[in-house]
């Protein structure tokens, strides 16, 4: 059984999708040890409780430095014998302590066809750009923002009559298929 921790900052829909894939047996030999969140009021906490997944709430402002924050996370992850970190809407850059402790073992999903539209509101950027195609990317995490090695991408059309909300739903649907598929191939 490979132990993973999932990091999320917001609603946690990708977190819950992964958990449901584990619970249904579609993601085999994986144990979700805990949800790690950096916001005490994040909806992902409710999703974790619904699935009886332990939750660690660690807000960086509780610590003297980013290094102290990450060292605390590394301690918790090591106590749970976590082997992989899966980022699912975690809105912080991963720093050197976590990167060093989990080198090559941190995945992220991003709602664009990287290297286009890194960072926040990637779907909005694609929508307003006039692009006709966008998608989702799973990549390894490095010290940059959405700059790690690309593992796999999935595409969808941006139709002229799509609203931004419709496009967000299309990309979310891609993510729900793509992320568990990549995790199944990579996390061993």
Curated annotation (Swiss-Prot):
Any single Gene Ontology cellular-component annotation: cytosol
The entry's keywords: Purine biosynthesis, Transferase
Enzyme Commission number, as recorded: 2.1.2.2
Residues that coordinate or bind N(1)-(5-phospho-beta-D-ribosyl)glycinamide: 12-14
CDD domains: FMT_core_GART
Superkingdom of the source species: Bacteria
Keyword Nucleotide-binding (UniProt): no
GO terms, biological process: 'de novo' IMP biosynthetic process
Site positions (Raises pKa of active site His): 146
Record GO terms (molecular function): phosphoribosylglycinamide formyltransferase activity
Active site feature: 110
Catalytic reactions of this protein: N(1)-(5-phospho-beta-D-ribosyl)glycinamide + (6R)-10-formyltetrahydrofolate = N(2)-formyl-N(1)-(5-phospho-beta-D-ribosyl)glycinamide + (6S)-5,6,7,8-tetrahydrofolate + H(+)
InterPro entries: Formyl_transf_N, Formyl_transf_N_sf, GART
SUPFAM superfamilies per UniProt: Formyltransferase
Enzyme superclass (EC): transferase
Pathway: Purine metabolism; IMP biosynthesis via de novo pathway; N(2)-formyl-N(1)-(5-phospho-D-ribosyl)glycinamide from N(1)-(5-phospho-D-ribosyl)glycinamide (10-formyl THF route): step 1/1
Residues holding (6R)-10-formyltetrahydrofolate: 66, 91-94, 108
Gene3D superfamilies according to UniProt: Formyl transferase, N-terminal domain
Family the UniProt entry places it in: Belongs to the GART family.
Function as written in the Swiss-Prot or TrEMBL entry: Catalyzes the transfer of a formyl group from 10-formyltetrahydrofolate to 5-phospho-ribosyl-glycinamide (GAR), producing 5-phospho-ribosyl-N-formylglycinamide (FGAR) and tetrahydrofolate.
Name of the protein described by the UniProt record: Phosphoribosylglycinamide formyltransferase
Native source organism of the sequence: Staphylococcus aureus (strain COL)
């Amino acid at each position: 059984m490979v132990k993973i921790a999932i990091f999320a900052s917001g609603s946690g829909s990708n977190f819950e999708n992964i958990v449901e894939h584990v619970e249904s047996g579609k993601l085999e030999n994986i144990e979700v040890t805990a949800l790690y969140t950096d916001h005490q009021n994040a909806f992902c906490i409710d999703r974790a409780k619904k699935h009886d997944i332990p939750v660690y709430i660690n807000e960086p402002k509780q610590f003297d430095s980013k290094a102290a924050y990450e060292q605390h996370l590394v301690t918790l992850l090591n106590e749970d014998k976590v082997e992989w970190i899966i980022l699912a809407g975690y809105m912080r850059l991963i720093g050197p302590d976590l990167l060093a402790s989990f080198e090559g073992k941190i995945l992220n999903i991003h709602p664009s066809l990287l290297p286009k539209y890194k960072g926040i509101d990637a779907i909005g950027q694609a929508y307003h750009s006039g692009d006709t195609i966008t998608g989702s990317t799973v990549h390894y995490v490095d010290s940059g923002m959405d700059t790690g090695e690309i593992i796999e991408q999935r595409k969808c059309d941006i139709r002229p009559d799509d609203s931004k909300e419709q496009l967000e739903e299309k990309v979310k649907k891609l993510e729900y298929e793509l992320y568990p598929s990549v995790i199944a191939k990579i996390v061993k």
